[in-house]
Amino acid sequence: MRKYEMLSILDAGTENQSEEIAKIEDVIKNLGGTVSKSDAWGKKTLAYPIRKKTEGFYVLFSFELEPSQTSELRRILGLRAYVYRQLMTVVDE
């Protein structure tokens, strides 16, 4: 397994952000990964509108996942309406 960090921008208009964060953690766990940390950065103004919204809720996830599962994670999160964007990077040890 490899270590990854993923910065996600979620819908800031949703009432329960912790529920959305838990759903993303569940997706990672269902793909065989382990989440070591999820750090909510809070609501921030976007540099440009995304889906006609000007604010997003930023969350940084640290997790381990098999490299073969990263494309599936991107696909699943891309289908979620509450996930505006995500950027996943490999953490060098």
Model-inferred region functions:
Residues 1-57, 64-93:
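Long, contiguous binding/interaction regions
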